[in-house]
Each structure stands twice: as structure tokens, then as C-alpha cells.
Amino acid sequence: HSFSRRQRQMCIRDSFNRVYEGIIRKGKLGLPNGIMTFSQTPQPDLVEAPFAAEWSVDFLAESLKACTHVYYGDDNNGTTDAIGLDDYLKSLGDVTYGEGLHDDIAAQLISAATAIASLEDPLASFVVEQQAASFEVYAELQALVVLWKVDMMSSLGVLITYQDNDGD
């Protein structure tokens, strides 16, 4: 079965959003620091690699770096420039929803990486002892969700549905 270019783009974007929002933002920080629960009680046992305490923050940072590579179309660990999601935005030729949005996303990627760098290992202890600081990092990651999932998808004309809409 052959997919059209638009179908391939939609698959990439949908997968990208699921990985970033569900696995990275929520799974690696939102659940452990408790922001995803009604009581906002930290759940340090949910950090990634709980038995390798010195790696949890590194895994979060590397995950954001991987999403950054996908956004920019970086190949071979950032040494080769291929077509990325940023290129689709720039191709719109619109100052506000193309280049301007790309600039906002680029700035937020830097802010999110800087925020992650402020976390300390072991992350399981950090989310308990400095929960408010971990919430601030989460807020930086959440800002990317809005830029990617709402603004970028809207600019590119992609409809994200959470259930089938085929009419049956």
C-alpha cells in the first residue's frame, strides 16, 4: 500500500505529537512529579530508570534532543540537514504562522532544554524535594505542546482527531 505525501506527513506529525506529549512530557516528568494527578502528589517511583538514578534527567534531555532533531530534520545526530517540520512551516511563506511560529518554537526548544538542565539527579528525589521547580520545567515542556500540537498543526492545516471521524 502506497501512502500519499500528505498521509506520510500526517503520520509523522501524529507520531511526533504522541511521543513528545505522552512519553516525554507526561511519562518522564509529569507523572513522577505529580502534576498529572488530582492531588499533585509526587510519584517518584514512576521516573524512568528508577534503579539507575543518575540517568533519569539525561534520558529526559536526550528525548527532547531527539524531538528537536525531528523538528529540524537533523540526521546523523545533527550533522546532516534533511527536511524537518520546520521546513514545512517556513514553506508557508507567512510571516506570522510560518517563520514567526518557527522562531517561537526554536526559542521554546532552547527554553525547555535549559529548564531540563536545571533538574538534578536523582530525579526521584528532586520531584519530591523540589516539586515546584519540577513543575516549572514541566510548564516549559507544556509550552511546546501548545506550539507543536495546536499552532503548528493549525498552520499546516492538519486536523487532529481523538476518535474516528469516518461517519460510521
Which residues does each PLM region occupy?
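A cross-kingdom marker for long, charged
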Residues: 24-168
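Intrinsically disordered, low-complexity polar regions and short flexible loop motifs
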Residues: 15-19, 24
